[in-house]
């Protein structure tokens, strides 16, 4: 054994051992030392036995003791060598660990340097965009101050505001309002389209707890319009779910629904429909064909087909969703009524009015039984049914439904219907009768203004829409005075709480005179179901305004001064060139009129204000 140990030292003097060779030699020497230690231990035990025998016989005891001492010293040296070898091995292991940590830290430093450079570039770009935005904001603030002053003059153009809003509603793509996504509905049904996404529900399939935080984050980004963040976040989460849970897991279907919702908000209906088809196949295979989540996915897919104008393809999907919900929830569940509303709207776009009436009437009966007559869904469904009646020319049935909506809203607000508290439509018809029985020269027939003024309180967008639609129906019947009463009430309710000047001027305008206007609404219709409030009626009418709105001479002087100041301001903001008509910022009607060099002079008596006529013609 000693020869083995000594043999390890017979290396050339000029040769340098590597770390691996040193470690190998150290392990080999350690094994040799352990063997030598075992041999010495055995010899020492033998000598101890010999000493015991010699003590009994009394022979050469000293020599044996000397051998034992030598063996003990050798064993101590061997143990020292073993401990040193163990220290060397532990040190080598520690150095290896430190080296690997050092390599990791170097890689992390390189990555952080790259990220720091990227952040510096992003910061520089953001600072440039911020500088441009601040310049634009400063320019817009100057124009805003001027337009705020112009807005105060437009209190005389309230009729023009009403016409502009209705023309805008008629030109709007109705499909954006026709099909609210089922995932946007909550119990109150009062969220707008941007806010509805933030309250997204999964229609019978609750989002798993581990996905809820991610879902809320994605919806928040989508509501802010930050799709460049929401879409990659959804895709990354979808890839992680597919890798960990498999493509056929229900959570993957939930994530596909969320991504489809984001694409839907971006008007990418094809991509959203593709994702919903994948989610539908997953849910059918994992949850069963009759699960409520399958019904929700079918409904959302039908919604997307409807937005693309594929009503025939959407109808069987919606019909199947209705059958599932009737089977799972029962025929009188509110979700069944929502599905009936969707199916009715699809049939309405295909001209199947008998089916539309049947579905709306059944949905209305469910809402009244399950939620009560005061639930907002009841008023919305009645509004949609009335729109269907109007399309078929059933004006008396539509008028009855509109009056029921307004009467119910009045009862909720005032508690009863009596001589002191009448619904707004009763006031409108009374004013119509008074306008026919009295001539305008005999005096102002609106001394009772305060009575119907109190009935104008409207707290629901559905009621506001009903006011406009019933007013349109009155105009078609030639009841111009009643129509204007309802339209003024609807306009007041839209401005209530947002335009204090308009609130204080309603009574003054009615006291000065009753300016009627010629109105014409486009052929398009817009109805919101399952949480929508808009219902623009497809009605055309024309009326000859006999009232006049006198303008004072001081207002003409103000407009002369305003013309000069506005021209200077526009030249200052945009140079010598005039503002193009296609500007993204909507200008005040009065300013548009003043900047036209060939505009006709102001008339002293007309049904519509000059600024409103110009605004309507330019749009």
UniProtKB/Swiss-Prot annotation:
Stretches the record annotates as Disordered: 156-200, 571-619
Compositionally biased residues, Low complexity: 609-619
GO cellular component: cytoplasm; kinesin complex; microtubule
Protein location: Cytoplasm, Cytoskeleton
TPR repeat windows: 55-88, 211-244, 253-286, 295-328, 337-370, 379-412, 464-497
SMART domains for the chain: TPR
Positions where Phosphoserine occurs in the chain: 174, 460, 565-566, 590
Residues in coiled coil: 32-150
Entry keyword set: Acetylation, Coiled coil, Cytoplasm, Cytoskeleton, Microtubule, Motor protein, Phosphoprotein, Repeat, TPR repeat
Keyword tRNA processing: no
Modified-residue entries (N-acetylserine), positions: 2
Top-level taxon in the UniProt lineage: Eukaryota
InterPro entries, per the entry: Kinesin_light, Kinesin_light_repeat, TPR-like_helical_dom_sf, TPR_rpt
Family to which this protein belongs: Belongs to the kinesin light chain family.
Protein name: Kinesin light chain 4
Native source species: Rattus norvegicus
Gene that specifies this protein: Klc4
């Amino acid at each position: 054994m000693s020869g083995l140990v000594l043999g390890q030292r017979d290396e050339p003097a000029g040769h340098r051992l590597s770390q691996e060779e040193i470690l190998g030699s150290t392990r080999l020497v350690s094994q040799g030392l352990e063997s030598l230690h075992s041999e010495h231990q055995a010899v020492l035990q033998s000598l101890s036995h010999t000493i015991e025998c010699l003590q009994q016989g009394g022979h050469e005891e000293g020599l044996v003791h000397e051998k034992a001492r030598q063996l003990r010293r050798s064993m101590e040296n061997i143990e020292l060598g073993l401990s040193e070898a163990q220290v060397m091995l532990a040190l080598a292991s520690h150095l290896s660990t430190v080296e690997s940590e050092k390599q990791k830290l170097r890689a992390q430093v390189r990555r952080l340097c790259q990220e720091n450079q990227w952040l510096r570039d992003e910061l520089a770009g953001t600072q440039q965009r911020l500088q441009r935005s601040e310049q634009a904001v400063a320019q817009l603030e100057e124009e805003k101050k001027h337009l705020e002053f112009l807005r105060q003059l437009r209190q005389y153009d309230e009729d023009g505001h009403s016409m502009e809003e209705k023309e805008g509603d008629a030109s709007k793509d109705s499909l954006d309002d026709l099909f609210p996504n089922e995932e946007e509905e909550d119990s109150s049904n009062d969220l707008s389209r941007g806010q509805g996404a933030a309250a997204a529900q999964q229609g019978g399939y609750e989002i798993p707890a581990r996905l809820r935080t991610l879902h809320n984050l994605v919806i928040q980004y989508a509501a802010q319009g930050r799709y460049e963040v929401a879409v990659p976040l959804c895709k990354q989460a979808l890839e992680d779910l597919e890798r960990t849970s498999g493509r056929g897991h229900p959570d993957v279907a939930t994530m596909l629904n969320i991504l489809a919702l984001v694409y839907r908000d971006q008007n990418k209906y094809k991509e959203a429909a593709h994702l919903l088809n994948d989610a539908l196949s997953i849910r059918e295979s994992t949850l069963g064909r009759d699960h409520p989540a399958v019904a929700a996915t079918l409904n959302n897919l039908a919604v997307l087909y409807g937005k693309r104008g594929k009503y025939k393809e959407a109808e069987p999907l919606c019909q199947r969703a209705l059958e599932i919900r009737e089977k799972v929830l029962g025929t009188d569940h509110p979700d069944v009524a929502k599905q009936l509303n969707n199916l009715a709207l699809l049939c309405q776009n295909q001209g199947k009015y008998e089916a539309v009436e049947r579905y709306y009437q059944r949905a209305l009966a469910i809402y009244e039984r399950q939620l009560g007559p005061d639930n907002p869904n009841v008023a919305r469904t009645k509004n949609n049914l009335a729109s269907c009646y109007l399309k078929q020319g059933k004006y008396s049935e539509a008028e009855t439904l509109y009056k029921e909506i307004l009467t119910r809203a009045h009862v909720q607000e005032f508690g009863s219907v009596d001589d002191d508290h009448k619904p707004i439509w009763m006031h409108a018809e009374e004013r119509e009768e008074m306008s026919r029985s009295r001539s305008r020269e005999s005096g102002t027939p609106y001394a009772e203004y305060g009575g119907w003024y109190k009935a104008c309180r409207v707290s629901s967008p559905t009621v506001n829409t009903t006011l406009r639609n019933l007013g349109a129906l009155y105009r078609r019947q030639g009841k111009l005075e009643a129509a204007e009463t309802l339209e003024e009430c609807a306009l007041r309710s839209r401005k209530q709480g947002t335009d204090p000047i308009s609130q204080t001027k309603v009574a003054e305008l009615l006291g000065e005179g009753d300016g009627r206007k010629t109105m014409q609404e486009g052929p398009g219709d817009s109805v919101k179901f399952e949480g929508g409030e808009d219902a623009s009626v497809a009605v055309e009418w024309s009326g000859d305004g006999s009232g006049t709105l006198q303008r004072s001479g001081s207002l003409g002087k103000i407009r002369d001064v305003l013309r000069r100041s506005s021209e200077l301001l526009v030249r200052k903001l945009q140079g010598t060139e005039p503002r193009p008509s296609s500007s993204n910022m909507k200008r005040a009607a009065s300013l548009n009129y003043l900047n036209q060099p060939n505009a006709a002079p102001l008339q002293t008596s007309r049904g519509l204000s000059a600024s409103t006529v110009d605004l309507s013609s330019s749009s």
